[in-house]
């Protein structure tokens, strides 16, 4: 039954998600093209520096390409955010609105229903995350004229606290991407839990309550991890490196716990507490 529910969820998600993914890819490719064009115009401006008019025009064109590249980068980021909003609102609509009455009459356990929605949502979020990582890598290659080491550095920054102890190599890049995928699971799980708690507690403005819960819970978790991370940086170099590694593992465990616990608690609340009447 889990497989059937998962397939049904994917059929409902894939068309809107494909449009958002296409926007992300097109924006990323155009942005990379603008970066390459900026470099070409800058070189041309160097040759034309003896001619005031040509140099001024080249300078203006460089600004245009830079702004276009920044706008394309914003579109990539906005597409990534949009897919999470789409996932969350579909979960809310199919569980806690009038459509939820029909959903909850299905002859399946609430845990199976929520799990199917989570895995479909996580698959989409993971796909968008990987595409965003690939576009960021290509953009960095364009900016640095093919310097692969800088790509490794950028990807390793996705590793959270582990980025402070990594050497920017392949292993750090893999850890960074893996942490980004774990963060995607955390985001989906926490969103589902926040929406469920909002539907349970709030009589009105349930979505607003869910947003407040999501921000509040996420802020508390980030604050606690930040405090632990700062405390871990007290000591000699060897101790700090080890402790930051511990904090990195702790961060991953917490994110996975929030993802799994959010799904489990959401399923329990849907079954036992949420009243759609």
Stretches with model-predicted labels:
Residues 1-100, 110-277:
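Hydrophobic alpha-helical transmembrane segments of membrane proteins
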